[in-house]
């Protein structure tokens, strides 16, 4: 155990934690250059180690990962005896594969300083150095990472049975599959701690039911920690169900003005830039080049996966060769996501990650200098998470959100109310209309070479609009205010797509582009061959349909229409009888008797009404006869 801290030690010193941290943990954080704890670590670690349930809300980039990893490791290594084989001591649940992988890597780095755990984790033959052997009774932490898409559930179970890990780090779905196996045990005698990282994100992604199923498989007597940059009402529901008298830790940031309720790091400069739709994508390079030194790692956020796919082909034309653009979104296969994520992390030249909100939460991407929100997020809560990819762990960072002139500028005041103030981007940027036109033509030149790019652009534009229309700040982001033609030119579209929002649009849907659409081809030969076949089939089917309609219209007699009308009436009557029959069958005897009495009463009323009508007709006829008897000149008709 680490020695007691000397008098006068800062309350944020690692040596000041009570109960004291192990010597090897102190060595680990010292080797990483963490001379003292962050505020969230200083608050959460002692509580979580002292057998308290915790709900931790702290700004992004504030060191939440170590706030739960250190207590988990310390707890498992202070047990009276090792956890039994195939029993689990702790579980850490993450919303995304990338975040789970990152937590796993941090844990491995930490356990490298604990020889028994390091020896258990390192596969034999990994290097030539002899492996130190420890007895079976030695306490150690052995983690397993569970990720959907990279391994099968059967492979996960096989690894679990072979290595008997006592800590699981996983996304919800794959974790539930493993816990459903009868070979995996989480009894109260073994299970100690559950951590939900980015808890509100877990619920936003629709994992609530899965989480509830997981909680039902875990003992109620456990320590639970919820960690997030924002705690939503949905998280409060999980708190009520899954935590016992939790301690809430809320860490705020004190800015230079003394305001203490900012929700983002003080080292992060959050700005906005107003730009017309036609100039939006053209402003990206000037933003990058106006900052000194030039950002080495930048993240561009857009609203949809389709947008990432399309802009990944278009933006390099505008950014030039100075920046490497790397796409990443949630619909990429798992291996592609991991490959592109690693490319960005390990890049040694100025690089840009073009992504969706899959990268907005939890990921500790080192040395991100700049975040540009090309599309403001639909959910305002996501805004601070996006910004927080820069300015992490005290590092200086800049974030920029792009807004259209007009009503969208009200977003600045909206963010101020939400305690996430933004200031104007400090470097003036000027784009001319001629520059915008040149960029549009350059994009269209590329798109005209392959119809697949046109299809991708149409899909991306429609999906962007759907996202825009669902913005929670709908009074600010109004579809009715959009300049369709300017947007079409900005995106480099060859025409505006067909969609309900353009039903009343009276402008130029072709965007001034003259193109031979019938001969506009795909680069992929198989796809182009199929397109031509479909065109031919459509032409033949259209001709046949026209011929059939003509023959049908010539041969249909008026009497057939009468027959059809009679048949329709007959079907309606039969349907009514069937409904009445089903209703009668569902009645009780009492209800049937009451229905009979009601029917009898109605029949009596109808009969009386009919008798009254017959009497009135008779009286009327008698009156007319009397009048006729007194009229000698009454016309009797022709013979």
Curated annotation (Swiss-Prot):
CC per GO annotation: 90S preribosome; nucleolus; nucleoplasm; preribosome, large subunit precursor
Biased composition (Acidic residues): 628-639
Span of domain Helicase ATP-binding: 45-249
Reactions it catalyzes: ATP + H2O = ADP + phosphate + H(+)
Short motif (Q motif): ranges: 14-42
Residues forming coiled coils: 521-624
PROSITE patterns: DEAD_ATP_HELICASE, HELICASE_ATP_BIND_1, HELICASE_CTER, Q_MOTIF
Pfam family of the protein (one): Helicase_C
Cellular compartments annotated: Nucleus, Nucleolus
Biased composition (Basic and acidic residues): 575-622
Entry EC number(s): 3.6.4.13
Gene Ontology annotations of biological process type: assembly of large subunit precursor of preribosome; maturation of LSU-rRNA
Matches recorded under SUPFAM superfamilies: P-loop containing nucleoside triphosphate hydrolases
SMART domains: DEXDc, DUF4217, HELICc
Domain notes: The Q motif is unique to and characteristic of the DEAD box family of RNA helicases and controls ATP binding and hydrolysis.
Similarity annotation: Belongs to the DEAD box helicase family. DDX55/SPB4 subfamily.
Name of protein: ATP-dependent rRNA helicase spb4
């Amino acid at each position: 155990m680490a020695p007691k801290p000397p008098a006068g030690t800062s309350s944020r010193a690692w040596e000041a934690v009570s109960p004291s941290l192990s010597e090897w943990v102190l060595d680990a954080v010292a080797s990483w250059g963490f001379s003292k704890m962050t505020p969230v670590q200083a608050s959460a670690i002692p509580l979580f180690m002292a057998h308290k349930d915790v709900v931790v809300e702290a700004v992004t980039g504030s060191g939440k990962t170590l706030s739960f990893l250190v207590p988990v490791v310390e707890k498992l290594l202070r047990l009276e005896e090792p956890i039994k084989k195939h029993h689990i001591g702790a579980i850490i649940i993450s919303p995304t594969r990338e975040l789970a992988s990152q937590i796993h890597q941090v844990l491995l780095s930490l356990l490298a300083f604990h020889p028994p755990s390091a020896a258990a984790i390192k596969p034999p033959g990994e290097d030539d150095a002899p492996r130190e052997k420890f007895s079976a009774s030695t306490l150690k932490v052995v983690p397993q990472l569970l990720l959907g898409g990279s391994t099968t559930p059967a492979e996960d179970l096989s690894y679990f049975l072979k290595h008997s890990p006592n800590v699981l780090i996983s996304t919800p779905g794959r974790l539930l599959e493993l816990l459903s196996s009868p070979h995996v045990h989480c009894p109260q005698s073994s299970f100690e701690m559950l951590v939900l990282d980015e808890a509100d994100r877990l619920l936003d992604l629709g994992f609530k039911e899965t989480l509830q199923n997981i909680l039902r498989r875990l003992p109620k007597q456990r320590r639970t920690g919820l960690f997030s940059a924002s705690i939503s009402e949905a998280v409060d529901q999980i708190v009520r169900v899954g935590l016992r008298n939790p301690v809430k830790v809320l860490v705020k940031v004190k800015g230079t003005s003394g305001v203490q309720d900012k929700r983002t790091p003080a080292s992060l400069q959050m700005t906005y830039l107003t730009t017309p739709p036609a100039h939006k994508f053209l402003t990206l390079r000037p933003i990058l080049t106006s900052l000194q030194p030039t950002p080495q790692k930048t993240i561009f956020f857009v609203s949809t996966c389709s947008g990432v796919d399309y802009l990944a082909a278009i933006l390099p034309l505008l950014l030039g060769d100075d920046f490497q653009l790397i796409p990443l979104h949630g619909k990429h296969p798992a291996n592609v996501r991991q490959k592109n994520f690693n490319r960005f992390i390990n890049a040694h030249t100025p690089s840009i990650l073009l992504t969706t909100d899959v990268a907005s939460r939890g990921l500790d991407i080192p040395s991100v200098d700049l975040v540009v929100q090309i599309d403001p997020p639909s959910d305002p809560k996501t805004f601070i998470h996006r910004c927080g990819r820069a300015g992490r762990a005290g590092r200086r960072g800049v974030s920029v959100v792009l807004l259209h002139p007009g009503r969208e500028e009200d977003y600045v005041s909206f963010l101020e109310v939400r305690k996430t103030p933004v200031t104007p981007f400090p470097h003036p940027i000027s784009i001319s209309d001629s520059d915008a036109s040149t960029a549009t033509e350059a994009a269209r030149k590329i798109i005209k070479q392959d119809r697949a790019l046109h299809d991708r652009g149409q899909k991306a534009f429609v999906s962007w609009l759907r996202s825009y229309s669902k913005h929670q700040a709908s009074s600010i982001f109004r579809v009715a205010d959009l300049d369709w033609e300017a947007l079409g030119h900005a995106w480099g579209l060859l025409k505006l797509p067909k969609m309900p929002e353009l039903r009343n649009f009276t402008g130029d849907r072709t965007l001034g582009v003259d193109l031979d659409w019938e001969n506009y081809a795909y680069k992929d030969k198989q796809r182009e061959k199929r397109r031509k076949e479909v065109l031919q089939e459509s032409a033949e089917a259209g001709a046949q349909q026209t011929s059939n309609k003509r023959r049908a219209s010539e041969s249909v007699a008026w009497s057939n229409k009468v027959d059809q009308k009679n048949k329709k009436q007959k079907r309606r009557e039969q349907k009514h009888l069937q409904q009445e029959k089903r209703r009668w069958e569902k009645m009780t005897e009492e209800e049937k008797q009451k229905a009979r009495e009601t029917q009898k009463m109605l029949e009596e009323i109808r009969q009386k009404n009919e008798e009254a009508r017959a009497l009135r007709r008779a009286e009327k006829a008698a009156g007319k006869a009397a009048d006729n008897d007194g009229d000698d000149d009454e016309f009797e008709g022709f013979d």
